Design a protein with these regions (language model features):
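Repeat-based blade/solenoid architectures
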Residues: 59-68, 112-120
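Residue-level signature of beta-propeller blades and closely related beta-rich strand-turn architectures
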Residues: 85-87, 138
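Sec-dependent N-terminal signal peptides
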Residues: 4-14
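N-terminal targeting signals for Sec/Tat export/insertion, comprising classic cleavable signal peptides
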Residues: 26-57
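Surface-exposed loop/turn elements that mediate protein-protein interactions on large endomembrane-trafficking
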Residues: 46-61, 97-113, 154-167
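Acidic, glycine-anchored loop motifs typical of Ca2+
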Residues: 29, 73-82, 123-133
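Acidic, small-residue rich beta-repeat scaffolds with periodic aromatic anchors
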Residues: 19-33, 37, 135-258
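Structural motif
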Residues: 43-46, 89-97, 141-154
Length: 258
């Protein structure tokens, strides 16, 4: 059920950011004030931070400041500023700055790129620590169109001032998600799909491309669980096309799924 909620959130997120793109922001947390002013002529954002009324930071951003939050990742822990940026457009791109104000300096501790998916903060395992949950959009447009692309689960934690991938800690969620991916895959297999005639033939917008993008997401989920060989066993079983070896090489070398 959890991944259904994540997918639902991503759909809502995409609609929301497009509706709010270009809006100005003026947010205050304690003695720190954040202002974001979007210039429609230059298509850029002037991002200003003031502490006790004194300007301590200003930068022109090519992205729109979608949201500014102050969050604790652990109960009673340190509070950080989360700056959610969005580039605009139907399918791209969302990113996150995790920052703090130290003295009179605005310091970006780490950043995350979420592409088309967006992200949400949620305590997935109910242990009191919030995770950053997203769909990994690394396969967007890689094998077929955006609508057919699958977004495998990605979970990060913020620890020691760094965003750390901990997707593999959520094996139950990954298995649950794999069930949906495999259901979609079996439907395509049942209907049948035409293989490319040559190993360099483009499979974009074809059924073979759809099979590739689903298999890629399955391999990614198995990779997160430390069982990537199971994903490739399924590729060998299902995708018997002339470009299979090239496809596997792309997954291993370009996407580092090995």
């Amino acid at each position: 059920m959890r991944n259904i909620l994540v997918i639902f959130f991503l759909v809502i997120f995409t609609s929301a950011v497009n509706a709010q793109f270009g809006e100005n922001r003026d947010t205050t947390f304690g003695d720190v004030r954040f202002e974001a002013r979007f210039d429609t002529a230059k298509y850029e954002t002037t991002f200003t931070i003031k502490k006790n009324g004194k300007k301590i930071y200003e930068e022109n951003l090519t992205d729109n400041v979608y949201d500014i939050l102050q969050e604790q990742f652990q109960p009673g822990g340190k509070k950080y500023f989360l700056i959610h940026l969005y580039s605009g457009g139907a399918h791209c791109c969302s990113s996150l700055l995790v920052a703090e104000v130290s003295g009179d300096k605005f310091v970006v501790l780490d950043s995350g790129f979420y592409g088309n998916s967006g992200f949400m903060l949620e305590d997935l395992d109910k242990n009191g620590t919030k995770e950053i949950v997203s769909g990994n959009d690394m396969f967007a447009y890689a094998f077929t169109n955006y609508a057919e692309t699958r977004f495998p689960l990605r979970v990060q934690k913020f620890e020691n001032n760094k965003l750390v991938d901990i997707t593999g800690n959520f094996k139950g969620d990954l298995i649950y998600e794999l069930g949906f991916f495999e259901e979609d895959l079996n439907e395509l297999i049942k209907e049948g799909f035409a293989c490319p005639e040559k190993d360099d033939e483009d499979t974009f917008n074809t059924d073979a491309g759809s099979v590739k993008t689903i298999l890629a997401a399955i391999v990614a989920d198995y990779y997160s669980m430390g069982q990537v060989e199971r994903g490739y066993e399924l590729v060998e079983k299902v995708y018997k096309c002339v470009d299979k070896d090239k496809y596997i090489k792309i997954l291993k070398e370009d996407f580092k799924l090995k």
